[in-house]
Amino acid sequence: MDNLNNITLNITEIFFSLQGEAKEVGLPTVFVRLTGCPLRCNYCDTAYAFKGNNPLTISHILNEVSKYNTQYICVTGGEPIAQSNCLKLLDSLIEAGYKVSMETSGSIDISPVNSKVSIVMDIKTPSSTEEKQNRYENLSVLQSKDQLKFVIASRSDFDWSCDLLKKNQVKSEVLFSPVYESLEPFQLADWILEKKINAVSYTHLPLPTKA
């Protein structure tokens, strides 16, 4: 058995807040933000997580999250699985009895992720400038417990996303999110109704992000 005192990950922050998006919106959640990301999306709101040097052992992380009265843990980034030890962290959180979700850019193979983890995966739209990094093979890995997210800045992004959904059978829930200050939420909602697609439109709740 691995010694969790010897396995480290580079962590940007661990904080307690309400989940501001996706299925668990509004639920008290501990967020574990891992450092580093291979992408540079032009609308990224967590660029502060690109770099840093704060190695923590998995034992330390488990101890930190246990201080909060919640069963919900969200592992995020950056890009969490850019760090290979993230898989062991996810396994350890599941073994500890938590309900775990992981937010990923979709640019790295998600098939090794523990099957009990709920995956929230982006597909990068053209306006992100990182469309070429999409790993489309991941679409077939997603299950009904998971979520596929499109961040939309324009009508062309939306039409591109709808075309991709037509070409792929996706088992997961589909989410559309407007880029802040680029697209009004009501406009995105109108497009979804116009296309009559089975998707959820949401915006981030204005919630605190630090404990």
Where is each model-derived feature located?
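N-terminal pre-triad scaffold of radical SAM enzymes
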Residues: 7-40
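Conserved Radical SAM active-site core
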Residues: 9, 28-29, 39-117
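Radical SAM/AdoMet-radical enzyme domain recognition
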Residues: 85-166, 170-172
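Short Gly/Pro-enriched loop/turn and capping motifs at secondary-structure junctions
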Residues: 153-157, 179-184
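C-terminal folded domains that constitute the principal catalytic or ligand-binding module
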Residues: 175-177
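Catalytic cores of alpha/beta
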Residues: 186-189
